[in-house]
Amino acid sequence: MTAVTDIIDELNDSSLSSTRLRELCLQLRKKTDTGCAITVSDEVNLIESLSYHSISPGVDIQINTDVLQTIDYYFQRNKSEHDEIMCVLISKLQPLLLKRKSNFELKEQRNLGLKPTLGMSLKEDNLMQAWVSQGGLKGIPLFYVILLHLKRRDISTNLSWIIPGILNILDDTTDIRRIKLRGVLLLQTLLNHTFMNETNDSKWIQFSSTGLFPLFEKTLINMCYFLPPSYNADETIAIWRVVFPTIQSLYKVEFLDNYTKYQYHLEKFMSEIILQNIIPRASLAYENLTLYALECTMNILRLQREGSVVHLQRLIFVLGEYIVRNPFYTTFPKLISKTLSVVSTLIKVCPNERIVAHRFDILSLILVTYDKCSQEDALNESILQQCKETISWLLNCDCAMGEQLSTLSKQPRFQLLFEFS
């Protein structure tokens, strides 16, 4: 079997193929299974070399789970040396970090008032370009792996370099996908894999005590407005897929002990970002954006449960005005299905009495969808079944619409819809 030092050399070869990387990961995991001896020094070098392959170097953020699994194997096999390994990895990472903001500057930045300084943007862009040209991007995957394995008890002693390191990447204006968005990924990892561990143990520092919430929230919310035509739709969706989950994690960690504030910020995000901006602007012109917005809508509805009632009237209006009423609605079967799924979710999570109050508005969304599809030869078995199921959910709320539904069911155009098995 190949020696660990030879594998490290191969991992550091810039021409290493993805196929060969998988083979090396398999070999390394077999070494752990057989209890093959390895020095701490070699283990550190191995984890470092593997870490550089944990995130793809291209524009799209692709996490290599094979590499992460292999790294985890080596951390697990040598738990007693975990702290020593992490200490060395951190010392290897720090020289690779972009050094643009000091702790003093971060404190100043928490004052969110506008303080323009002539020429600063150009100076910072030049610093970023120099950092990239010197191979600075190489440090981001290592940063990511360190955050994945950093223990909760070690956060406070490392925040002095973690926070500036993440913010300096987040503040980039030169390359959204390859730099700025990777900063969002690092923040998400910090929130999900460090601050969310041992959340009930008061002896460890809480995220809310750092005072960084407004700074991170402002940056993330601004990225939600990277919309067409200023940005390509594919670029926008790639940004949202990282930013939206990070915003939810940020709210969860910041308001861990304040459920009311957590719900308020989810409600604000849904109202201001999704219902007032994304869906009206994307509509059917950018199907993939609207599909993702509707998927996020369902996730927030499930998180808010009965609290979703605050969105009921607005959501019904937005679905009807910007999606269902669109004359090209029936040419987007995925959008039809997702819209019906949102309506079903809304019915399930909101209090029955509020659904009853809006029963005819909700019924109209279903009927118009069904009727349009039927009239325009777009009604397939899947859509028909979804329409029937959504009506069933509505009826389960004791909506007392027997007379109206009986009249509708006698109309030839709606007979198929009301044929329940």
UniProtKB/Swiss-Prot annotation:
GO terms for biological process: cellular response to heat; cellular response to nutrient levels; cellular response to salt stress; chromatin organization; DNA damage response; positive regulation of DNA damage checkpoint; protein stabilization. Keywords: Chromatin regulator, Cytoplasm, Nucleus. It holds the Pfam family Tti2. GO terms for cellular component: cytoplasm; nucleus; TTT Hsp90 cochaperone complex. The keyword Nucleus applies. It is found in: Cytoplasm; Nucleus. Component of the ASTRA complex probably in chromatin remodeling. Belongs to the TTI2 family. Present with 1470 molecules/cell in log phase SD medium. Component of the ASTRA chromatin remodeling machinery complex composed of at least RVB1, RVB2, TRA1, TEL2, TT1 and TTI2. Component of the TTT complex composed of TEL2, TTI1 and TTI2. Interacts with TEL2 and TTI1. This is TEL2-interacting protein 2. It comes from Saccharomyces cerevisiae (strain ATCC 204508 / S288c). The lineage of its organism: Eukaryota, Fungi, Dikarya, Ascomycota, Saccharomycotina. The gene is TTI2.
